[in-house]
Amino acid sequence: MTDQDRRRALIIESSDEIPRKSFLKRFPVPRNFGVAPGSRVRRGRQWPAPSGAKQPKTFQIYRFDPDSGDTPRLDTFEVDLDDCGPMVLDALIWIKNKVDPTLTFRRSCREGVCGSCAMNMDGTNWLACTRAIDDLGSPATIYPLANMPIVKDLVPDLDHMIAQYQMIEPWLHEKTPAPESERLQSPQERARLDGYYECILCFCCTSGCPSHWWNGDRFLGPAALLQAWRWLADSRDEAKEERLDTLE
């Protein structure tokens, strides 16, 4: 069984079988992220602008395939903005469709709802589908989220982040018998959840958190902590003391 298989197997194990306080001790943060020690990002291939392009923009994009045995590189692409949508994700799709089909990245909703296309653009973690190309410099630099192993190119391995999210048990805990109708909240109780339940688990915040960089085996990170508070603040939840004990 590979290390990745072990990580995935750990994620799907029932939390009842793993004491929550020891959960992270069984899930250490990988330190080399699949990159050889001392490796530097090297200059990669340069792809010219299409013939006749009147509004080209330069994108420098991180490329890395851990299975290839090669070191990371930055490929340079000239994107014709007249033939491309306004968002960074549009540019990535344009490159994949028209220049280099091997470029790998996540995307799904294209509406800022799913969190799949989170990446680092010009030094800032953002969703590629909501970041305008015009907001980036030239060249625009595109990297995967930091502090995570790389599956390929702009695709980070989220296993550790998901395991930390699972640890806080992000569902309603009930001790009293279920009512015949739904569990009601007052408007004021419901309003306490505003700003928390909207989290789409893109992990931009956790990727950019220095405390998580150095202590990810013990510190849950901002995304998981926000979700923990979301359930602590929920008037319907009946396991607040247990949740607080888990977070100690």
State where each predicted segment sits:
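Short, contiguous pre-domain boundary segments
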Residues: 38-41, 70-75
